Amino acid sequence: MRIRRKKWVEDELKNSVLYIDRTEDTKNKWKNIFDIDNNGNKNDFEIHIEIGMGKGKFVSSLFKEYANNKRYSNTYIIGIDMIEAMLGLAKREIENRILDISKEERESIIKKRDGSYTNIELKEKVENINNIDNFKKIRILNANAENIDKYFGKEDNVTRIYLNFSNPWPKDKHKKRRLTHMTKLKKYLEFLSGKKEIYFKTDDYNFFEESREYFKEIGFKEEIITHNLQNDDIYLKKAGIKNIITEHEKMFLDKGIFINAGIFVYNNK
């Protein structure tokens, strides 16, 4: 997705506890990054990641969903993208969710000619957001999926990956770029732990069917699949969380396009 450079992004990311730069050494260190205290129990936490999070609608909604679900009380979330402007938008989206404010309210904070600001109370809330406890369970990472295994290891307890509406790369010469391609799946298995789940959604039927073959070839089992996500109650129940409709998904649904989805679990027996 093409997106214009935004002047405010660099400073906002640099000063946010949410943001982890691609230059940081994170492999097998996410427990320390999240400051997880599990009383010496090595595996008493899980990390779920979304690769290609875009503007952050999914991870911010997932964060709120997990916060209200005891099943995910020890689960931490990382949204990943390689485009700095996207990371900036995702940062604001997450902050807005935590503060329970709209994008429009956030944008109402305007610096006036005399140097003062409109909506001072909200401005102070935003400035102090790094001190909110909720921030302890979510991060955004600037990273390229091509070397995703550089940022995660087995000690990080990454048990689930979300892949939502990633580029289908339909031309044969580009298919290795797919986030579901076998080369990527092998990289994910370098660090996936526990159940080793991948939740995959796309509007592209051919991309979905070819991806099913990739998963099968590497040794993943299909826990459940659907070609009509919105109307498949069995799938939604199996997923364990409500379906979070992103901007892409809404656009496709408005056009009458069915959503394909699958939960794939690695069979290492």
Predicted regions and their residues:
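Conserved SAM/SAH-binding beta-strand->alpha-helix loop
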Residues: 83
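S-adenosyl-L-methionine
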Residues: 1-49, 57-65, 94-154
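Class I S-adenosyl-L-methionine
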Residues: 211-213, 218-269
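A short glycine-rich, Lys/Arg-flanked "PGG" loop and its adjoining helix->strand segment in the class I
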Residues: 180-194
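Conserved glycine-rich SAM-binding loop
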Residues: 54
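Conserved beta-strand signature within the Rossmann-like core of class I S-adenosyl-L-methionine
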Residues: 195-202
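Conserved SAM-binding loop
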Residues: 90
